[in-house]
Amino acid sequence: MILQEQELKWSLEKGKSNMTIKGITFIGGGSFGTALGIMLAKKGYNINIWDRKPHVIADINEKKENIKYLPNVVIPSNVKAYKGMKEALVGIKYVVISVPSHAIREICRNMKDYLKEDAIIISVAKGIEEHSGKRLSQIIKEELPKNPVVILSGPSHAEEVAQDIPTTVVVTSEDVKASLEVQNLFSTNKFRVYTNDDIIGVEIGGAVKNIIALAAGISDGIGYGDNTKAALMTRGINEIIRIGEKLGGQRETFWGLTGMGDMIVTCTSMHSRNRRAGLLIGKGLSMEEAIEEVGMVVEGIKACKAFYELKEKLKVSMPITDALYRVLFQGEDAKYCVYELMTRDKKDE
């Protein structure tokens, strides 16, 4: 009872201080964007959610629930969904992009005419651009050069954030002031936010871990055990480190929340769509069938293709990524790929 009273007092105090902010807009009404919007609405902010899908907009506004992406979670009254991007963005200082990574560039181009010049762009997407290999912050900065860009990443499944289960994430930016603003904006007594100055490491860790989670799911689907998953995760973090350092990231970042932490939760959680897709593929479904069954974007599939191209170009050893690419895009048998991984040349750890 005392804890509930403290939380209510804390929420009311935060709500008073938040009256000066006109609102926060989320571009994309998926599960994670909705969960973060609910969390910030509880702090007293007015939340706008823009989405293309009429049924998502209707459900949020009329039923106060995102039935498609975050069912059985009540959405507060100070959350409103919009079909028009201009209406959702005008006068807003904080804009959270929560769309699939492949849509980032198009979304930024569509937003450009409606943004305040000092609006801070916060991306919670994870991935890199196919063919160019550019990180999402680079894409956003190319399209919106006047606006500060902040990346929010870490082990944070939407289903748990929406239920106020204690969660810890990281924000990073080339603009230190913007990073600190976003840290303050998102921090609650159930959602702890650290800052980190290694934007490259944070973004690469968050993108590559989805590849490892897909592989871990396939292992589970085949019927392999904890030994196999432990090996995949441990060797997987080494792949993250190798490609991450090659791209300019710092090794210590990959052992933190946005590397090891995010990989652990994505490889093991029942909420992980990447692990779930891998599980289905391991049980015999095709990649297309697995995506349809999951019903949401599986970032690890696009990441696998993009990082396969990038590691070939940079000549970085990523054997798990290699094996997954052959399973997904060349039709090789997953068990045979595991056999190949296990019988590679002997070497020191």
From Swiss-Prot:
Q: Which GO terms describe its molecular function?
A: glycerol-3-phosphate dehydrogenase [NAD(P)+] activity; NAD binding
Stored Pfam families: NAD_Gly3P_dh_C, NAD_Gly3P_dh_N
The entry's protein name is Glycerol-3-phosphate dehydrogenase [NAD(P)+]
Pathway terms, separated by semicolons: Membrane lipid metabolism; glycerophospholipid metabolism
Record-stated family: Belongs to the NAD-dependent glycerol-3-phosphate dehydrogenase family.
**Organism, scientific name:** Clostridium tetani (strain Massachusetts / E88)
The gene behind this protein is gpsA
Enumerate the Gene Ontology biological process terms: carbohydrate metabolic process; glycerol-3-phosphate biosynthetic process; glycerol-3-phosphate catabolic process; glycerophospholipid metabolic process; phospholipid biosynthetic process
Q: Which residues bind NADPH?
A: 31-32, 52-53, 126, 158, 273, 297, 299
Listed binding positions for sn-glycerol 3-phosphate are 126, 154, 156, 209, 262, 272-274
